[in-house]
A protein has these predicted regions:
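Transmembrane-helix motifs of polytopic, lipid-linked glycan transferases
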Residues: 20, 94-116
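Membrane-lumen/periplasm interface segments of specific transmembrane helices
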Residues: 29-30, 199-273, 297-301, 305, ...
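Signature aromatic-anchored transmembrane alpha helix within multi-pass, membrane-resident enzymes
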Residues: 16-21, 206-213, 268-272, 279-296, ...
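Short acidic/glycine- and proline-prone juxtamembrane loop motifs at membrane-interface regions
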Residues: 38-41, 135-146, 310
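Specific aromatic-rich, kink-prone transmembrane helix
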Residues: 104-109, 129, 148-167, 171, ...
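Perimembrane helix-loop-helix junctions
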Residues: 4, 9, 161-162, 184-210, ...
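Membrane-embedded, lumen/periplasm-facing catalytic core of multi-pass transferases
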Residues: 160, 341-385
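Short helix- or helix-capping micro-motifs
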Residues: 23-27, 123-134, 158, 172-176, ...
Length: 385
């Protein structure tokens, strides 16, 4: 390699590192009060015990909690941190926030790619909207699967749109070993390439299915069940496939993604902006067709499968919606765009503290912190009595 090429390649990483720091700094600052927050719900009941089984005993299949179909990708990532710095709540939170920072960076890079032909600099808005979102705020520090799945979905999609198909397939392998439902993403890529008769490149995206299949074989050999345990299979497949459950789940997904937490402001802006020919042209691009297919496939999959209708399952789609909203807002006059953006950001931040007037998972906003503190009070009371 010529001597001049090596410094040039190194310099390409400098802007990315600066952007990563730009996004990581506010994310870490706003989470400083919560770095020692005790684990919550699925963290304590599933993912941390699984990670500790791997860390302390080298067991890829959990034995201190009930095993299930979820691949151990996130747990393996946490074990790397535990090997370097030791196990603690704070180290776990920091490890997840690092991944969340990459999620903000990838949202920005993907927004640049998808907003080509749009006036202004709309790519800066989606990371801001994601940072202000209550769901991302809580999930970015929690040892769960959906925020990491969001990160690798964005990475795989970005690489695919850049026509780096082998790298996109590799990112997809990591994605499905992070969360099994991520398989829908390389499946969309496979179909897109088959439609273009790019058979060899489409073949790359068989690798994620093979990786997930290998994990299922390991899980079956260790537990005797393809999904880890019969209760998990019944609740997340058998029960979930009831038509009433599917219909209700789909409505709930649509409501949360497009209306809840003042996202209806973005939806209205998007619908109005689509009346503009230039905006429609952006969304009719091949890149957006693939992106919309990925988002739609994710929404349908998490509506059909999964007994718990948790909003965190929509995390991989949320940045894509924010990118679409940012492009739509760029089509309006500056005052209108600024007012709508300010209202949307303010609404998202308010919903971090304000609980909706209907039942919701506490992990969707800061109610999870209140609940953890309540559990601490109850534990101290139980110890004294």
């Amino acid at each position: 390699m010529p001597a001049r090429a090596r410094p040039a390649r190194r310099h390409k990483w400098v802007p990315l590192a600066l952007c990563f720091a730009l996004f990581a700094l506010p994310l870490f600052v706003i989470h400083l009060p919560f770095l020692h927050l005790p684990f919550f719900w699925d963290e304590l009941g599933q993912f941390i015990p699984t990670a500790l089984d791997l860390f302390r005993h080298g067991a890829w299949i959990a034995h201190s909690t009930t095993p299930n179909v979820h691949p151990p990708g996130v747990e393996a990532y946490l074990v790397l941190w535990y090997e370097l710095f030791g196990y603690s709540i704070a180290i776990t939170r920091v490890a997840m926030l690092v991944l969340g920072s990459f999620g903000l960076l990838l949202t920005f890079l993907l927004a640049i790619r998808l907003s080509r032909g749009t006036p202004g600099a709309p790519a800066f808005l989606p990371p801001l909207l994601l940072l202000a979102s209550p769901l991302f705020f809580t999930q970015s520090m929690m040892a769960q699967l959906d925020m990491p799945a969001m990160v690798f979905t964005l990475l795989a999609l970005l690489l695919f749109l850049r026509e780096q198909y082998a790298a996109a397939a590799a990112a997809s392998v990591v994605l499905v070993l992070t969360k099994e439902t991520g398989l829908v993403v390389p499946f969309v890529f496979f179909l897109a390439l088959v439609a273009q008769r790019k058979w060899k490149r489409a073949g790359y995206f068989v690798a994620p299915a093979a990786a997930l299949g290998l994990w299922l074989i390991v899980l079956h050999n260790g537990t005797g069940y393809w999904l880890g345990n019969p209760g998990f299979a019944h609740y997340n497949v058998g029960y979930a496939l009831h038509p009433v459950h599917v219909a209700f789940s789909f409505v709930r997904r649509v409501y949360y993604l497009f209306i809840a937490e003042f996202r209806w402001i973005g939806l209205v802006a998007l619908l109005l902006a689509l009346r503009n020919r230039a905006t429609r042209r952006v969304f009719h691009s091949p890149a957006w067709r693939v992106t919309i297919a990925v988002a739609a496939a994710q929404i349908v999959l998490v509506s059909v499968l999964g007994g718990a209708e948790l909003e965190r399952y929509l995390l991989p789609v949320l940045p894509l919606f924010y990118i679409a909203v940012s492009i739509a807002l760029a089509a309006f006059r500056r005052r209108v765009s600024f007012a709508a953006t300010a209202a949307l950001v303010a609404g998202l931040v308010a919903c971090l503290f304000w609980n909706p007037p209907y039942p919701f998972p506490y992990e969707d906003n800061l109610a999870m912190v209140d609940f953890v503190h309540l559990q601490q009070i109850a534990a101290r009371f139980a110890e004294r009595n």
